[in-house]
Amino acid sequence: MSLRIYNTLSRAMEDFSPLEPGHVRMYVCGMTIYDLCHIGHARMMMAFDVVQRWLRSSGLRVTYVRNITDIDDKIIRRAVERGITIRQLTDEMTAAMHEDIGALAIEPPTVEPRATEYVPQMLSLIGTLERKGLAYRAGSGDVNYAVRRFEGYGKLSGKSLDELRAGERVAVQDDKQDPLDFVLWKAAKPGEPPEAKWDSPFGTGRPGWHIECSAMSCATLGESFDIHGGGADLQFPHHENEIAQSEGATGKPLARFWMHNGFVRVDNEKMSKSLGNFFTIREVLQQVDAETLRFFIVRTHYRSPLNYSDVHLQDARASLKRLYTALALVAPEDIGAIDWADPHAARFKAAMDEDFGTPEAVAVLFELAGEVNRTRSARLAGLLKALGGCLGLLQGDPQAFLRQGVQLDAAEIAARIAARAAAKAARDFAEADRIRNDLLAQGIVLKDSPAGTTWEAAQ
């Protein structure tokens, strides 16, 4: 196939073909569910939603695994703060996550494993690492990974152990042989809830974060698979540690391709709660509709930084409106399977085949919209809708999208349009203008054409 992907591991563009012909296996690190999803989470899940959509559009079968971390220090603290069980908290936050990302048309993964369901596999993996001399039991009761014993440590980051130590300013701990060593099994501490503890050959405790993903990816996809993805913030140490664990245990490459989406910034500043510029998906959806937020994210390449601002959101809304305006002109023809030999479709495919180049693909959608405006072609409108569908866009009713935000009842608007038509027929143009201006003041734009008068929201 013609698809090329930027591989973080090699720091280069590479031709992609799946290990198993026709079948792509992809693992993405999902949410640690102690709070509502924010726009950074939306960006990550949207990026890999587009990836799996395009792989399927290219005729490939995709097994997409996106995990849920449902045991973690933050989860334990939040459950204690709220006076509820860990399971109550994680069930509540999982349901909220599904609701939020469902609104954004993010398709569910093929498999969504919860960490707490795979503790036996984690214990087995830790046992293998200990037998191979890659793990040791610390005086605290923890089991740690010995990074200096894994020859390839640092290959994803492209840095030596010394560079990683200096860059991360890792604190020296008495029970670690190296400051970069990380915990595989955390010994239970006094006062922790019973549901945060498991009996094990290493003592009562719970798994470390990194071992969770190694165990879940192996259990659901096998020892080696095609794509491992996540946010850029996970490249080190999380993904570096996953490689050390999985490859240390199996002796096989964990993933052929490593993909990382860029950070979200807010008004050109880092997004953080301390700066007061931290927004949940639900907060953003109080300002704009879900498809506008999706379009805002998708039109930026997944590896580039995404700058969130009210201005950029409104620009995205206006741009998406242009595409829906074209689809409102003529009923799109159901074209069935996309003909990739069509010049527009071919340019779209070329863009997406170059590391999922959504900015260039979106540009093709605007080219098509221009052609639909010019020709009123139902076939081209159908192609515009079909190509938009590859990105999870343009599947709604155009008139409904264009009329969002209008408070006036549709029947009342129709009555006023009829009154305006009667005024024009009676050559009472002052009254006709008054009706138009009155509707405009209420956020309604009238559009006259030989076929009659239609309306849409002004914004």
Swiss-Prot record:
Transmembrane segments: none annotated. Monomer. A motif ('HIGH' region) lies at residues 31-41. GO terms for molecular function: ATP binding; cysteine-tRNA ligase activity; zinc ion binding. Its main location: cytoplasm. GO terms for biological process: cysteinyl-tRNA aminoacylation. GO terms for cellular component: cytosol. Its EC number is 6.1.1.16. It catalyses: tRNA(Cys) + L-cysteine + ATP = L-cysteinyl-tRNA(Cys) + AMP + diphosphate. Keywords: Aminoacyl-tRNA synthetase, ATP-binding, Cytoplasm, Ligase, Metal-binding, Nucleotide-binding, Protein biosynthesis, Zinc. It comes from Paracidovorax citrulli (strain AAC00-1) (Acidovorax citrulli). CDD domains: Anticodon_Ia_Cys, CysRS_core. SUPFAM superfamilies: Anticodon-binding domain of a subclass of class I aminoacyl-tRNA synthetases, Nucleotidylyl transferase. This is Cysteine--tRNA ligase. Pfam families: DALR_2 (PF09190), tRNA-synt_1e (PF01406). The gene is cysS. Binds 1 zinc ion per subunit. The keyword Metal-binding applies. Its cofactor is Zn(2+). Zn(2+) binds at C29, C213, H238, E242. Belongs to the class-I aminoacyl-tRNA synthetase family.
